[in-house]
């Protein structure tokens, strides 16, 4: 399920935080106030407290908990595979998978890893069915792959909603994408591959070169819009 982070507890935690990296110290000293500024430094983000300080409204969603049993010489060994997505519903999303012996600690590990793998999301209005103005769809058609799973996201008009399977919907929802058409190919029943292919499509958008004129025409934004 979804959980929201924030509130007074978060600030209490941050007050007790002793940063180990240069970027962490800059955040704690108030030199860096936004995630965009943190990315612009070019410094690696290695401390999860940096994310908690700069994007306090992140929510997490555990997409899958799979039990893996193996027989060893000393008996049956049980481990868990946890897939987790985090996002602020407004242009930032992260996805991670972790393995561990206990469910609770593995979920926590996956949440931390997803926060450290956070990406800005490119959104816009690329649908010919849409009127002029900003939109929260994908600006262009884009495909992501994971294993044999392929997920293609296509611009949809405002109000269309997320026309995609439940796993993809949960990833896009956390990213702040509200309208999308999609098509899928390959093994689409595996939650992990479907989620990773959807996330990889959003990553692919960031690698796509779009001219300044098209950016204006498609009302493209990257990261948080605040609306």
Model-derived features: where do they sit?
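Ribosome-associated RNA-binding proteins
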Residues: 1-227
């Amino acid at each position: 399920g979804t959980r929201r982070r924030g509130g007074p507890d978060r600030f209490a935690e941050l007050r007790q935080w002793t940063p180990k990296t240069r970027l962490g110290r800059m955040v704690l000293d108030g030199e860096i106030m936004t995630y965009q500024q943190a990315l612009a430094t070019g410094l690696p983000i290695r401390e999860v407290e940096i994310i908690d300080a700069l994007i306090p409204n992140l929510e997490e969603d555990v997409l899958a908990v799979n039990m893996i049993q193996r027989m060893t010489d000393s008996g049956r060994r049980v481990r868990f595979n946890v897939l987790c997505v985090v996002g602020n519903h407004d242009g930032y999303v992260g996805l991670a998978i972790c393995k561990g012996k206990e469910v609770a600690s593995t979920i926590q590990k996956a949440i931390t890893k997803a926060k450290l793998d956070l990406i800005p999301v490119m959104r816009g209005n690329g649908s010919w069915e849409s009127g002029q103005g900003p939109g929260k769809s994908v600006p262009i058609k884009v495909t992501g792959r994971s294993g044999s799973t392929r997920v293609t996201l296509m611009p949809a008009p405002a109000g269309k909603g997320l026309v995609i399977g439940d796993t993809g919907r949960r990833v896009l929802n956390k990213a702040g994408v509200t309208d999308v058409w999609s098509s899928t190919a390959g093994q689409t029943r595996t939650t992990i591959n479907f989620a990773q292919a959807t996330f990889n499509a959003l990553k692919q958008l960031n690698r796509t070169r779009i001219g300044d004129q098209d950016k204006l025409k498609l009302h493209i934004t990257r990261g948080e819009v605040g609306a």
